[in-house]
Design a protein with these regions (language model features):
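Transmembrane helix-loop-helix hairpins in multi-pass inner-membrane proteins
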Residues: 15-130, 209, 213-271
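Core segments of transmembrane alpha-helices
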Residues: 60-64, 141-144, 165-177
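A short amphipathic helical element positioned immediately N-terminal to and/or at the very start
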Residues: 36, 141-153
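Hydrophobic/aromatic residues in alpha-helical transmembrane segments
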Residues: 1, 13, 32, 173-180, ...
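Membrane-embedded helical hairpins/re-entrant loop segments and their flanking transmembrane helices
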Residues: 1-17, 180-196
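Membrane-interface helix starts
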Residues: 150-164
């Protein structure tokens, strides 16, 4: 069933809003799935589309960031220890997640064995209290991603389209500080800002804070200080972060509220 454009846009706003207010952006997809199912789109088809999009987007962020790190390696190595550690942490977390997704897509049984071993180890260490419940969650997650992976294997061009769309989306997002500079009358190179934002995103994306609040602002000031100076980097940070996160948080919150109450009392449309 084809999802109308405006309905898709409202789901995207929902994803942004709940991702922004939950640690490590964990709340976006479950709420997207909730609203899609509530609106009459089948749970299986909804989860397929969300999982496929999330899998490719995760890999796009990693590839984009790693390419920019490789192209600006000397700049990265010249940063402080905290930035380098954040970057390594981000690469490891995103790399692990992307690798696990690929493993599930192409070899679900092996991925299930690995995740069950990890769950067993965490249970023996006392980190996981309810081992059976954790195993059920792992098996359910593997099953969902395997079905999404089967779709991507059957329609590889869909993955290519999602990758291209994600790359364009990330490019637009990463260029917000550049346009903030231009708005403030500061001369800047779009290429430098694109590289810095890709590195910054990769460094803070895995920080378990809602919207990476604090980590994003602090890392922004450290990275951009060498390019703009302390005074200008603070002004650019306020404007660009205000546009790309706080303004979008308000807009997506209003859109989510509309989505929540607009269909209250209306029956779900048939699938």
């Amino acid at each position: 069933k084809k999802v109308p454009y405006w309905r898709s846009l409202s789901y995207a706003f929902t994803d942004f809003y709940f991702s922004a207010i939950t640690p490590s952006a964990t709340g976006g997809q479950p709420m997207q799935l909730y609203y899609m199912v509530r609106d009459g789109f089948g749970a299986a088809h909804s989860s397929f589309s969300l999982l496929a999009t999330a899998a490719v987007y995760q890999m796009t962020v990693l590839v984009y960031g790693c390419v920019m790190v490789g192209a600006n390696l000397s700049f990265v190595m010249g940063q402080g220890r905290i930035i380098r550690l954040l970057l390594v942490f981000g690469v490891l977390v995103n790399g692990f997640c992307s690798g696990l997704i690929l493993l599930i897509i192409f070899h679900g049984l092996l991925a299930e064995k690995i995740m069950l071993c990890i769950a067993g180890g965490l249970s023996r260490a006392g980190i996981i209290k309810n081992r059976k419940r954790a195993i059920r969650k792992v098996e359910g997650l593997i099953d969902e991603y395997s079905r999404g992976g089967a779709y991507l294997r059957q329609y590889p061009l869909a993955a290519v389209r999602i990758f291209i769309h994600s790359a364009v989306q990330l490019t637009a997002l990463y260029l917000v500080p550049y346009w903030a500079c231009r708005a403030l009358g500061i001369s800047a190179s779009a290429k430098d800002f694109l590289a810095l934002q890709a590195i910054l995103s990769l460094a803070v994306t895995a920080v378990p804070l809602p919207g990476s609040v604090g980590a994003s602002e602090g890392s922004f000031l450290v990275l951009y200080r060498t390019l703009l100076g302390a005074g200008q980097s603070f002004s650019v940070m306020l404007l660009s972060r205000g546009i790309s996160f706080y303004a979008m948080l308000c807009i997506s919150g209003l859109a989510t509220a509309f989505l929540q109450f607009a269909r209250r009392g209306k029956p779900a449309s048939p699938v």
